[in-house]
């Protein structure tokens, strides 16, 4: 199957609706992906890239239905990774003498994967051209570390199509090929997710490389990526987004993520978020439990944020393993222009929060004070968490904050009456977790100030996941 891209250019790639893991299990491809290969038929026939190795046989069979393989004059490999050049061994078994145009670094990568040094490699550099007839040329532009040392782009004159490799792509599978045909919200979510999780470490290279390409003063009518859609409607919009994302990008957003053993650190996270919102109701605050959340969504939110609060319980005097792993990933992604603070609960000995603070600083974050709580935070400790959130909101504000009206403390009789109206605290008879009506349970959409009688029947204990029927009135409040 092929799809007409423009004039004598056809898409001959492979859709992968089922793929959910990429780069091992490091990247969750929740909307599948595609491996884009392009066949150009001018006076010379050119194949740009292949597909993932698991589709090698299918790819060659489909390609044979489009063209006699012996009629392919040139193969262009923009990138040697297996999702781009994976079908080379299957293809070259049929046409072993066909020249392969790629960078010098790509030869090393291709031989490292396919082990065929005898293939007919042709090394190209930035500015080199290849005449393909009918007055058209291919112009090559090296793009090292976007995102491998071997990467390059290929520009086709006449049709003004930039074959951009991984840049401007997204792991997004759709039967429709072009950017103006697909759901725009989904598309741009996946574009940002792709940039945040794959290209962020190389942001310092993005702007000068785009500037270099624009310096050729070549028109760009289409951008044909290696994954996802082909940009035919206003293709420069994605280029402009890349320039924006590469420039120490941040939004007025704070990301909080944590891991917890006994729910204590989660309670801290909720209270910190409440404090932030009290002082700055306009800032977007997102909370994630790393054990239950999509890691790449967390990292995308960190990319978007001006700051991040990371929480961990102490286990064996160190931070929780999932937190340690995610902080290591953030170190590799080399986020810039971001602030951070560590927090967490511990028992008889701490250690995790201090260790976490050091690791966040090593990862390049500008650090704010950390916060610790011993055992399960009581009302006083939770108020300290809220105050920490208030302080963070003020310290990390991007613009003057709205003035808050000082609340007058109610008389004691009113406070007692209000507290009584909420009813008693409830304790899980299995794990001893306590439901406090004053705090509610935000992760289950139970707002602070919700009496137990108004808690939905489908409520589950956050600790042991059992229902309301296992709860009793807290013994100290029973009459």
From Swiss-Prot:
Record-annotated Rubredoxin-like domain positions: 423-474
Subcellular location: Cytoplasm
GO molecular function, one term: FMN binding
Cofactor(s) recorded in Swiss-Prot or TrEMBL: Fe cation; FMN
Sequence positions that bind Fe cation 3: 428, 431, 461, 464
Keyword Disulfide bond: no
Pathway(s) annotated for this protein in UniProt: Nitrogen metabolism; nitric oxide reduction
The record's free-text note on cofactor binding: Binds 3 Fe cations per monomer. Binds 1 FMN per monomer.
Domain (Flavodoxin-like) ranges: 254-393
Region (Zinc metallo-hydrolase): 30-210
UniProt keyword terms in alphabetical order: Cytoplasm, Electron transport, Flavoprotein, FMN, Iron, Metal-binding, Oxidoreductase, Transport
Residues reported to bind Fe cation 1: 79, 81, 147, 166
Binding site for FMN: 260-264, 342-369
InterPro entries per the UniProt record, alphabetical: Anaer_NO_rdtase_flvorubredoxin, Flavodoxin/NO_synth, Flavoprotein-like_sf, Metallo-B-lactamas, ODP_dom, RibonucZ/Hydroxyglut_hydro, Rubredoxin-like_dom, Rubredoxin-O_OxRdtase
Superkingdom of the source species: Bacteria
Subunit relationships: Homotetramer.
Main function: Anaerobic nitric oxide reductase; uses NADH to detoxify nitric oxide (NO), protecting several 4Fe-4S NO-sensitive enzymes. Has at least 2 reductase partners, only one of which (NorW, flavorubredoxin reductase) has been identified. NO probably binds to the di-iron center; electrons enter from the NorW at rubredoxin and are transferred sequentially to the FMN center and the di-iron center. Also able to function as an aerobic oxygen reductase.
Homology family: In the N-terminal section; belongs to the zinc metallo-hydrolase group 3 family.
Protein name per Swiss-Prot or TrEMBL: Anaerobic nitric oxide reductase flavorubredoxin
UniProt organism field: Salmonella paratyphi B (strain ATCC BAA-1250 / SPB7)
Taxon lineage: Bacteria, Pseudomonadati, Pseudomonadota, Gammaproteobacteria, Enterobacterales
Gene from which this protein is expressed: norV
């Amino acid at each position: 199957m092929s799809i007409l891209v423009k004039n004598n250019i056809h898409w001959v790639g492979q859709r992968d609706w089922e793929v959910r893991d990429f780069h091992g299990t490091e990247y969750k491809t929740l909307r599948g992906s595609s491996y884009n290969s392009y066949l150009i038929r001018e006076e010379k026939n050119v194949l740009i890239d292949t597909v993932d190795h698991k589709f090698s046989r299918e790819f060659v069979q489909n390609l044979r239905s489009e063209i006699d393989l012996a009629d392919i004059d040139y193969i262009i490999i923009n990138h040697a990774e297996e999702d781009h050049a994976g079908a080379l061994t299957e293809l070259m078994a049929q046409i072993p003498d066909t020249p392969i145009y790629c960078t010098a670094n790509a030869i090393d990568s291709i031989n490292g994967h396919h082990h065929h040094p005898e293939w007919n490699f042709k090394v190209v550099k930035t500015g080199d051209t290849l005449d393909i007839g009918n007055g058209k040329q291919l112009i090559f532009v090296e793009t090292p570390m976007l995102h491998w040392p071997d990467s390059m782009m290929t520009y086709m004159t006449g049709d003004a199509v930039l074959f951009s490799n991984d840049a401007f792509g997204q792991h997004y599978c759709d039967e429709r090929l072009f950017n103006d045909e697909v759901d725009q919200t989904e598309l741009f979510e996946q574009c940002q997710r792709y940039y945040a999780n794959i290209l962020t470490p190389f942001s310092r290279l993005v702007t000068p490389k785009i500037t270099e390409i624009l310096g050729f003063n070549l028109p760009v009518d289409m951008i044909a990526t290696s994954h996802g859609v082909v940009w035919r409607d206003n293709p420069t919009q994605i280029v402009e987004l890349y320039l924006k994302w590469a420039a120490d990008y941040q939004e007025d957003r704070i990301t909080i993520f944590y891991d917890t053993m006994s729910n204590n650190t989660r309670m801290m996270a909720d209270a910190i978020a409440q404090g932030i919102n009290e002082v700055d109701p306009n800032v977007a605050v997102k909370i994630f439990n790393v054990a239950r959340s999509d890691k790449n969504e967390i990292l995308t939110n960190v990319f978007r944020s001006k700051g991040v609060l990371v929480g961990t319980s102490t286990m064996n005097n160190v931070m929780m393993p999932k937190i340690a792993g995610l902080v290591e990933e953030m170190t590799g992604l080399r986020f810039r222009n971001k602030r951070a603070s560590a927090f967490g609960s511990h028992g008889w000995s701490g250690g995790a929060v201090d260790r976490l603070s050091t690791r966040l600083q090593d990862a390049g974050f500008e650090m704010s004070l950390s916060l610790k709580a011993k055992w399960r935070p009581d009302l006083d400790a939770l108020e300290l968490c809220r105050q920490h959130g208030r302080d963070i909101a003020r310290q990390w504000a991007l613009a003057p904050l709205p003035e808050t009206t000082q609340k007058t403390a109610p008389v004691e009789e009113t406070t007692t009456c209000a507290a009584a109206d909420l009813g008693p605290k409830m304790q899980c008879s299995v794990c001893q977790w306590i439901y406090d009506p004053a705090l509610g349970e935000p992760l289950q959409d139970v707002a602070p100030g919700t009496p137990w009688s108004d808690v939905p029947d489908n409520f589950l204990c956050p600790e042991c996941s059992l229902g309301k029927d296992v709860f009793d009135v807290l013994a100290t409040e029973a009459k």
